[in-house]
Structures are given as structure tokens and as C-alpha cells.
């Protein structure tokens, strides 16, 4: 039975990875986050939730102790300082982003290597400036903001570390600052702007969590060790490209929200951070999944699993 440690289990990504893994037979799951009391789940399976703060653990001693207690075979790193919390003019936010996004992945990789563990690390489309679109694994990183630069620096090249690049949307248990939660929080009868000049081909947190499950179990013929040796980062692009206007319209349709999405094309420059793929091993069928279908699967899982606890 593989033992898996999910770091950052109360964030948008970590919460979904935890919920999916706790329902997977044959996995021994340990969770970790800054405030374990915030973890809640409708899953009847008992789980250990450890306390861990990547920002405060500058010397790595807390991480070493956590791995010694948990003895994981795989670590899914869902810890990160996201864009809203590391604005360029925010000195404290910049410092946190450097510690957590850029430096922590190296401490994690080294600590995991000492114990024979493998690490799955999410990489972001925000390492690109969004001018050209269709960015492949070989496209140079050219973002100039704190988030993009720190996430770029945190992509670790090592045999026990697999960087998976994608952009994610999903529900949140706590902070509710994501695009989906923001939209769902709009009152019926309201109007929101939908940017038709912003293009995106990300994934749901459920899709990413299930990919992680395949990487741990070797599902769909995915061999972690072989994949980690294929390059610094692999792009995961199973879904079609949509505009943010179309995406918000799908939110309304799938979640039954009576919210009007106003089409906007003239506010700010066009943004296209869509990803291209040179090595389609993670999604060999290419971008064949309709975004509506991916969102319906996400909504169904959220309801059936009792995601919000």
C-alpha cells in the first residue's frame, strides 16, 4: 500500500487532492497544513492531519520531522503563495512567495530524496506573460511579476521530482477567493464581466487530483520514474481552450446560477496563457475534453463527496 503525504490540504488544490485520495482504495493518506483545525471532510475515513508551515520552516527541520513521522512514498505539494497574496508592491507577500514558491520546493525535493520519496509539484502557466499563447514545454519563461518569477524558480530538476504545468479552477473550503467561488458568490440577478480577449485551457482541481492518483498508482500506464526523466516539466492539457467569457457562461450553466455574463473585449490588453504540448504523455488524447463536461464532473464530485464538509 502506497503512503501519500498531501501538503497544503486546506487550500484549493490540496483540499481536492485530499478528498480524492481519501476515497482511493489502496492508499494510506497523511495530510499536512498550517492549521489542522481547519480541515473538514464528509469522508468517514479517519486521517492523520499534521501541522506544517512551509514559510516558517526556513531551516527544514520541521519538514524532516514531518517526513520522519509520515514516511511517505509520494508527496503531493499543494503549498503555494498565489497571486492575490504576493502583489509586486507587497513586501511581506514578496518575501513569503520567495520562501514558499521558490525555495521550499528545493528543501522538499532534497528531504524527500533522503528518504526515498517522490514529489509531484504543480507548475503554473503564469511563468508566461500571456502575449503569445500556445506556450510549450520549451517556451522561455518571461513573466515579470513576483508570482510568475518565484514559481519559475521553484521548478526543481531532479529524478524524484515531477513538475506538472497547468492552470487550475475549483471550489475552496475556506478562503473562497478563486474565480469559481467568486462567481458562485454572485447573487442571482446580478451581472459580471466576462473577458472575451482572455484565453485559457486549464483543468479542474478534480482532474489534477485524479492525475496525481494515476501517478501514484501507475494508472493509465504512467510510470513516475520514467516521466520524471523526460524533462524539467510536463504540460497537462486535457481540455479545450475557452475564453474567460465562455468560462463564466459555463459556470452559470453548470451550477444553475442566474447571473448575466456581459461580454467584454476592450478592457486591458488581450491575455493568452494557453498551453501547448510537445510531449502529450499526461493527456495522450490531446485537448479533447469539453470544458462543460469537466465542470459537470467537478460539480457532481463536490456534491456527492460532501466537499464542503
Predicted features along the sequence, with ranges:
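Mid/C-terminal beta-alpha module of Rossmann-like enzyme folds, strongest
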Residues: 209-272, 305-309
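NAD(P)-dependent short-chain dehydrogenase/reductase
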Residues: 144, 156-207, 213-214
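Catalytic helix-loop patch of NAD(P)-dependent Rossmann-fold dehydrogenases
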Residues: 91-99, 103-106, 126-164, 168-174
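SDR active-site strand-loop-helix element
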Residues: 7, 32, 78-79, 119-125, ...
Amino acid at each position: 500500500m502506497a503512503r501519500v503525504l498531501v501538503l497544503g490540504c486546506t487550500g484549493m488544490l490540496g483540499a481536492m487532492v485530499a478528498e480524492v485520495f481519501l476515497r482511493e482504495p489502496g492508499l494510506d493518506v497523511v495530510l499536512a497544513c498550517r492549521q489542522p483545525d481547519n480541515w473538514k471532510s464528509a469522508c468517514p475515513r479517519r486521517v492523520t492531519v499534521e501541522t506544517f508551515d512551509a514559510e516558517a520552516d526556513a531551516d527544514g527541520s520541521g519538514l524532516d520531522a514531518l517526513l520522519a513521522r509520515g514516511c511517505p512514498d509520494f508527496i503531493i505539494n499543494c503549498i503555494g503563495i498565489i497571486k492575490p497574496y504576493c502583489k509586486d508592491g507587497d513586501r511581506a507577500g514578496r518575501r513569503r512567495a520567495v520562501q514558499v514558491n521558490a525555495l521550499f520546493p528545493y528543501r522538499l525535493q532534497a528531504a524527500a530524496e533522503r528518504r526515498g520519496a517522490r514529489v509531484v509539484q504543480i507548475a503554473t502557466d503564469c511563468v508566461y506573460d500571456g502575449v503569445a499563447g500556445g506556450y510549450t514545454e520549451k517556451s522561455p519563461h518571461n513573466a515579470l511579476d513576483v508570482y510568475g518569477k518565484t514559481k519559475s524558480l521553484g521548478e526543481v530538476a531532479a529524478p524524484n521530482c515531477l513538475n506538472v504545468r497547468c492552470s487550475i479552477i475549483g471550489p475552496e473550503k475556506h478562503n473562497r477567493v478563486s474565480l469559481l467561488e467568486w462567481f458562485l458568490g454572485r447573487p442571482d440577478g446580478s451581472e459580471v464581466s466576462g473577458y472575451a480577449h482572455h484565453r485559457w485551457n486549464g483543468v479542474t482541481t478534480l482532474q489534477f487530483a485524479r492525475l496525481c492518483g494515476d501517478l501514484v498508482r501507475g494508472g493509465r500506464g504512467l510510470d513516475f520514474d520514467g516521466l520524471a526523466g523526460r524533462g524539467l516539466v510536463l504540460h497537462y492539457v486535457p481540455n479545450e481552450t475557452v475564453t474567460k467569457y465562455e468560462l463564466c457562461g459555463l459556470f452559470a450553466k453548470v451550477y444553475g446560477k442566474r447571473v448575466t455574463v456581459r461580454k467584454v473585449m476592450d478592457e486591458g490588453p488581450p491575455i493568452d496563457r494557453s498551453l501547448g504540448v510537445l510531449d502529450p504523455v499526461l493527456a495522450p488524447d490531446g485537448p479533447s475534453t469539453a470544458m462543460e463536461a469537466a465542470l459537470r464532473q467537478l460539480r457532481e464530485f463536490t456534491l456527492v463527496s460532501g466537499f464542503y464538509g
